[in-house]
Amino acid sequence: MAENFKYTLWFLAMAVLLGCESDREDIYTSNFKSYPLAAGSDFDYTGLATVRELRAGGVELEITLTGQKSTEPYFYPAHLHFGAYDSPDAPMAQMLGPVDARTLESRTVITQLHDGSVMDYNRFMVFDGHIKVHLAEDGPDYNTILVVGNVGANANMKINLEKMTMCSPYSF
């Protein structure tokens, strides 16, 4: 009897775990695209930005960095900008969820940009933009870019860090 109870408990636990995973996957369509994020400074980080189409509309943008994790809570600010990474005037299109230094991950649902325009998967694929993740939210470390990458229509542009422009935290 105790053996049957263990199997029943194990089966229920697996059903709950698998059920939670499928619920999460049900929020997406099959459309997604990943963009590489290049090191933007002497800090040893690279990454990947993955955009997924949401069934309810809009997109989820997930940033995953590769590099040194922290054991302390700290968050790297991340932004989606209009224009390519080397555009001299590239205003912020959307503040993204900060990257947690402990997990090196961030997720943001985007349905509308700061300018009021609607964002969906098809628009993101042709969006003239780029992503930057900063070392700090303000102060001198704000100008330190951990990773940078073009997205949407700019995805095939090669990154040349000498041409990277800084961004204003208040340019939206």
Question: Where are the model-predicted features located?
Answer:
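N-terminal leader/targeting pre-sequences
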Residues: 21-77, 82-172
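Bacterial N-terminal signal peptides that target proteins for export
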Residues: 1-9
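C-terminal motif of bacterial Sec signal peptides marking the signal peptidase cleavage site
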Residues: 16-19
